[in-house]
Amino acid sequence: MSMIQNDWLDSIGEEFHKPYYKQLYDFVKEEYSQTTIYPLAENIFNAFHFTPLSKVKVLILGQDPYHNVNQAHGLSFSVLPEQKDIPPSLQNIYKELQSDLGCFIPNNGYLKKWADQGVLLLNTVLTVRAHQANSHQGRGWEQFTNAIIQAVNQQDRPIVYLLWGKPAQSKIPMLTNPKHLILKAPHPSPLSSYRGFFGSKHFSQTNEFFNANGLEPIDWQIENI
């Protein structure tokens, strides 16, 4: 697993030396040697490489990585640019963006443009076996990503959390910073999107919050490639 090299280390570097992380590292290393694991090992920490802690403006919390080929690359909800089949949840995110902000629906699901603007696309579990959803739950990633969430909570500037679905919303007790905005909605999955994800207007609300605080809004439009 590639190490984190940027300012995240100042806040969460000690996690790498804790007993749980040693067990997690050994487990994940063994899994990669025995079977197909997503994302590629060098992409596990892409969310942190692309979005340094000092640049975080939005946190979008997912669960575990996509588990089919050419999908996961370390950013929640995002897929590799060569993947032309956009996952259903991301299709629904794009539909809401179109309804909310008038964004056109792009031909890809590569969300690095968001990450580059300070949108931390974080999954609570960072690895998964091919074709086995949730197969790396309960192995230690949750403790590690809780430390990430706590580090974001400590940042003394306006930040928005987009929490879609009950697992993401279970983190709300950790979010105590009065300068931060929490937006909740059902998950964009086809199973739940019609219960209130559609029409939630989280993207325009996020930008209104930044405008009110004198900050640059997010350009949510993903371009065609």
UniProtKB/Swiss-Prot annotation:
The active site is at D64. PROSITE patterns: U_DNA_GLYCOSYLASE. The keyword Transport does not apply. GO terms for molecular function: uracil DNA N-glycosylase activity. It is an enzyme of class 3 (hydrolase). One of its GO terms (cellular component) is cytoplasm. GO terms for biological process: base-excision repair, AP site formation via deaminated base removal. The keyword Cytoplasm applies. Its EC number is 3.2.2.27. It catalyses: Hydrolyzes single-stranded DNA or mismatched double-stranded DNA and polynucleotides, releasing free uracil. Belongs to the uracil-DNA glycosylase (UDG) superfamily. UNG family. Excises uracil residues from the DNA which can arise as a result of misincorporation of dUMP residues by DNA polymerase or due to deamination of cytosine. HAMAP family: UDG. This is Uracil-DNA glycosylase. It comes from Lachnoclostridium phytofermentans (strain ATCC 700394 / DSM 18823 / ISDg) (Clostridium phytofermentans). The lineage of its organism: Bacteria, Bacillati, Bacillota, Clostridia, Lachnospirales.
